[in-house]
Amino acid sequence: LASELKEFFPNNSVVYFVSYYDYYQPEAYVPQSDTYIEKDSSINEEVEMLRHQATASLLSRRDVIVVASVSCIYGIGSPEDYAGLAPNVDKKVPLERDDFIHALIDIQYDRNDYDLARGTFRVRGDVVDVYPPYAEHPLRFEFFGDEVELIAEIDEVTGEMLREYEAIPVWPASHYVTEKPKVKAALKSISEECEKRVAELKATDKLLEAQRLQQRTDYDLEMLETMGFCNGIENY
């Protein structure tokens, strides 16, 4: 269907948004054997790229057609936070290299100076290469002091410049990016709810369940506080 629509609307952005799981096993508990089975999944990187392309197109263009499955009804974070946290790099606007790096970390890009994969960035002197999860090729940003001298799309293997830009937004590496005040409020709310539920479990002599819930929640809260993200964040 998406391919047909691209033929009918060659000048529009026709994008594809479906579930990115190749395999998904929800968490489960077998009381007979007291066995806890953690959630397990495998994500299709190509489909994940298409999902990010759909999001980026919706926020940057008006001529967008989205082909989606029912998975699009599930919440994936705030559009306002997703758009508001994305740095818009413009040659005419002063920007320090270190400030740009901090902005990338805030929107959940991982630094990897050896293997530039989607969702990562690398730093070599005044040059920052970013590989957005929605892009076919990485972006290169060259700085001189607080000036952005070059914004270009490059070949990930040869480093050859493919296209140059005057300005470009860098959209987040995850749909679940959230402003820090909201994260702090969520941490407080989750902690309070956990305490209440743990007390209920202990009151009914379900000590093992209470310990497991407390341990898992504490781990997730620590990840949210330090990284801004945790596995299973959609459950919160």
Q: What positions do the PLM features span?
A:
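ASCE RecA-like P-loop NTPase motor cores
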Residues: 1-236
